[in-house]
Amino acid sequence: MAAKIKSGDLVKVIRGKDRGKEGTVKQVLSNDRLIVEGVQIVKKHVRATQQGQQAGIVSTEAPIHRSNVMVIDPETKQPTRVGITVKEEARDGKVKTVRVRVAKKSGKELA
């Protein structure tokens, strides 16, 4: 299945303690989880290392499941589902089929 949420997408959290927050996807992990900027902040206790890092409590983003976020439609600025359409493009004199992500609400292509 093609990836419907990619790094750099603007998403809105629809479930959980951070419901309603928006952020950009920093990283997509292999187990259907995402790291979203400014969402799911947790405090992590860190030991001092020999390289000079101090011990203490560090705030960092934890992964959130992809079912708990929706991509924001760039045209309507509202959360939307993502669909995939197949279109043909001419590249180097050859016609190739390309899968494109499309916002369901507006029908516009997502970057």
Curated annotation (Swiss-Prot):
Gene3D superfamilies on file: 2.30.30.30
Function: One of two assembly initiator proteins, it binds directly to the 5'-end of the 23S rRNA, where it nucleates assembly of the 50S subunit. One of the proteins that surrounds the polypeptide exit tunnel on the outside of the subunit.
SMART domains named among the record's database cross-references: KOW
Subunit architecture: Part of the 50S ribosomal subunit.
One protein family per Pfam: ribosomal_L24
Gene it is expressed from: rplX
Protein name: Large ribosomal subunit protein uL24
InterPro entries: KOW, Rib_uL2_dom2, Ribosomal_uL24, Ribosomal_uL24_CS, Ribosomal_uL24_KOW, Translation_prot_SH3-like_sf
Keywords recorded for this protein, A-Z: Ribonucleoprotein, Ribosomal protein, RNA-binding, rRNA-binding
One GO cellular component term noted in the UniProt record for this chain: ribonucleoprotein complex
Disulfide-bond pairs as recorded: none
Source organism of the structure: Bifidobacterium longum (strain NCC 2705)
Annotated GO biological process: translation
GO molecular function, one term: rRNA binding
Family: Belongs to the universal ribosomal protein uL24 family.
